[in-house]
Regions:
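Basic nucleic-acid-binding interfaces
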Residues: 2-13, 18-111
Length: 111
């Protein structure tokens, strides 16, 4: 029981650009993507993954996991967004992902 823990829904967004020139680099990139999926992230775009979290504490826990599993080369960035900010994203070309369409704003999805 954590008293005082707030429940402001957050999104953790991970953006990455990883080298894939060698077999080892391709393997590292694939392992990182698999880690993100296994850790509950959904692919928003090919190198952009997001995860819904009930609050900032949980978001920070997942940020630390991303840091531990990130490859040693390339570029990996992480951004915290409130659910309000995320739902106001404009899709200029293309359309929302199936996950975005199926989970209404502010509703956590548990699988």
């Amino acid at each position: 029981n954590r008293e005082g823990m707030s429940y402001k829904i957050m999104r953790v967004a991970v953006f990455f650009d990883l080298p894939t020139n060698t077999k080892a680099e391709r393997k590292a990139a694939a392992q990182f993507r698999k880690f993100l999926l296994d850790d509950g992230f959904d692919m928003l775009q090919y190198s952009v993954y997001t995860r819904l979290c009930p609050n900032r504490d949980v978001a920070e826990k997942h940020m630390m996991r991303v840091k531990r599993h990130a490859p040693n080369s390339g570029s990996v960035r992480l951004l915290y967004l409130t659910e309000h900010q995320f739902t106001h994203m404009h899709v200029i070309v293309g359309e929302k992902t199936v996950q975005e369409k199926n989970v209404p704003a502010g509703q956590l999805a548990f699988f």
